[in-house]
From Swiss-Prot:
Superkingdom in the source lineage: Bacteria
Main function: Methyltransferase required for the conversion of demethylmenaquinol (DMKH2) to menaquinol (MKH2) and the conversion of 2-polyprenyl-6-methoxy-1,4-benzoquinol (DDMQH2) to 2-polyprenyl-3-methyl-6-methoxy-1,4-benzoquinol (DMQH2).
Lineage: Bacteria, Pseudomonadati, Thermodesulfobacteriota, Desulfuromonadia, Geobacterales
Pathway(s) served: Quinol/quinone metabolism; menaquinone biosynthesis; menaquinol from 1,4-dihydroxy-2-naphthoate: step 2/2; Cofactor biosynthesis; ubiquinone biosynthesis
Keyword Chaperone included in the entry's annotation: no
Short name of one Pfam family: Ubie_methyltran
Family to which this protein belongs: Belongs to the class I-like SAM-binding methyltransferase superfamily. MenG/UbiE family.
Protein name, UniProt field: Ubiquinone/menaquinone biosynthesis C-methyltransferase UbiE
Length: 256
C-alpha cells in the first residue's frame, strides 16, 4: 500500500534518493486542502474580491525564463499560477506544478487539460520540502500563498534554491499584515471575523479559521527575507501588494 506521507527526492550531490516524511502538522494541512479543493477557486475569488488574480499576474511578471527552459510552481494548488506562467511566456517554456494535496492536483490537472496550455504544463504530487527534481533544473521557481503552509520553511526554501539554475530566481507571493494602522484595523476585522464565517458557509469553517491564524504567525517581511538569505538566496527583495495585504518576495541563486 502506498504511504501518502512519505516522499522522495534525488540528491544530486550525494547521488542518492533521499526520503522525506511529512510531520503530523503537515499531514493535517495537506488533508485540509484536499477537503476544500472543490471550492478553493470559487472562495479565492469571493474572499479576495478577485484581486488575487492581479497579485498572481504581478508575481509571474517577476520570473526569469529562457527559450526552451523550465519553470516550477510549488504548492501549485489547482494550477492558477502555472497557467499564468504559460500565458506570460512563449510556447517553448515548459511549466511543472507540484503540490502535496492529491485533491488539489486532481483538480489542477483537469483545469490544465481544458486550457490551451495542456501540452506545456505537467503536475505532480510532492511537498515543497522534497521537490523531486535534480539540482539546477529550473529558470524560476514560484510559490503563491503556499510558503506559510510549509512546516519546515528552511527545508522548503533550500529545496527551491537547490532546483534553481545558477542565476535563477525564486518568486514567492504570500499574505502579509498591512502597516497602515487604519487599514490594518479594517483588514484584521475582515480577516479574523468575516472571512472564516463566509468561508464556512461554502466550505469548512476550520480551514478558513486556519488561514488568518497562519498569516498572523508568518514572519515579517524583513524576517522572511532574512530566512531566505540564511539558506543561500541572494539579492532578496519584496514588493507590497494592495496596501500590504500581500507581498511578493524575490531571491536569486548565485552563479557558480
Amino acid at each position: 500500500m502506498k504511504n501518502l506521507n512519505l516522499y522522495h527526492f534525488f540528491d544530486c550531490k550525494d547521488r542518492k534518493i533521499t526520503m522525506y516524511r511529512l510531520t503530523e502538522k503537515g499531514e493535517r494541512i495537506r488533508d485540509m486542502f484536499s477537503d476544500i479543493a472543490p471550492r478553493y477557486d470559487f472562495l479565492n475569488r469571493l474572499l479576495s474580491f478577485g484581486v488575487d488574480r492581479r497579485w498572481r499576474r504581478n508575481a509571474v511578471k517577476c520570473i526569469r525564463w529562457s527559450e526552451g527552459g523550465r519553470v516550477l510552481d510549488v504548492a501549485t494548488g489547482t494550477g492558477d499560477v502555472a497557467l499564468e506562467i504559460a500565458r506570460q511566456t512563449p510556447p517553448s517554456v515548459a511549466i511543472v506544478g507540484v503540490d502535496f494535496s492529491e485533491g488539489m492536483v486532481a483538480l489542477g490537472r483537469d483545469k490544465v487539460a481544458g486550457s490551451p496550455y495542456a501540452g506545456r504544463i505537467t503536475m505532480e504530487i510532492a511537498p515543497c520540502e522534497a521537490i523531486p527534481f535534480p539540482d539546477d533544473t529550473f529558470d524560476s521557481v514560484t510559490i503563491a500563498f503556499g510558503i506559510r503552509n510549509v512546516v519546515d520553511r528552511s527545508q522548503g526554501l533550500s529545496e527551491m534554491l537547490r532546483v534553481l539554475k545558477p542565476g535563477g530566481r525564486a518568486v514567492i507571493l504570500e499574505f502579509s499584515t498591512p502597516r497602515s494602522r487604519l487599514f490594518k484595523r479594517i483588514y484584521s476585522f475582515y480577516f479574523l471575523r468575516v472571512l472564516p464565517v463566509i468561508g464556512g458557509l461554502f466550505s469548512q469553517f476550520g480551514a478558513y479559521k486556519y488561514l488568518p491564524d497562519s498569516v498572523l504567525e508568518f514572519p515579517s517581511q524583513e524576517e522572511f527575507k532574512a530566512l531566505m538569505a540564511s539558506v543561500g538566496f541572494r539579492d532578496t527583495a519584496h514588493r507590497d501588494q494592495t496596501f500590504g495585504i500581500a507581498t511578493i518576495y524575490t531571491g536569486e541563486k548565485g552563479l557558480k
